[in-house]
Amino acid sequence: SPKAIAAIKAGLDDLHRYPEVVLGDFLRALAAHTGLELSQLVVGPGSDELLTRLVHAYAGPGDELVHSAHCYGKFPIYARMAGAAPVAAPDRDFRVDVDAVLSCLTERTRIVLLANPDNPTGAWISGAELRRLHAGLPDHTVLAIDGAYTDYVSDPHYEDGLALAAGANNVVV
């Protein structure tokens, strides 16, 4: 298309330069889309890298990461990579059991990492249950929600956790 050709020609003068490091336009669009502040956003080369960095930032040797029993298979690996112990909270009918997650928390729990919706089961946690889980966390524990499959859920009781993250300093989505 003529517009595509014009855009390519317009960018030729800067091809030898590094791309914008701070991703300003992208981050502003992401903030507008999510309702979060720019200071609450972190982007990276993919969820695997971001989750690895998140776990390393908050957990280490002697710490614990709580996840659901039927979770994405790399969640316990992320914990071990950081030197932390993975703790599997029992599920109920292949769904996250918030009471079981809360009962697994100890002084050493630094992260509760859950996929919502879950991978591989597809089960999801309602907004009310997410808020109840968050309310039961000690101050030293981060609730990390992997929302890779959020767009597949259309039930009105589902919440992706962004509103929770907007108002809390220990929630990561």
Question: Residue spans of the language-model regions?
Answer:
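PLP-dependent aminotransferase-like
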Residues: 16, 24, 40, 57-114
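Hydrophobic alpha-helical segments typical of transmembrane helices
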Residues: 4, 26, 50, 74, ...
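Short gly/ser/thr-rich secondary-structure transition/capping motifs
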Residues: 45, 91-96, 154-155
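N-terminal small-domain helix-loop-helix segment of the aminotransferase-like
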Residues: 1-48, 53
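Short hydrophobic alpha-helical segments of the AMP-binding
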Residues: 30, 75, 79, 137
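Short glycine-rich anion-binding loops that position phosphate/pyrophosphate groups of nucleotides
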Residues: 47-48, 72, 116-120, 149-150
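Active-site pre-lysine segment of PLP-dependent enzymes
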Residues: 80, 98-108, 120-143, 147-173
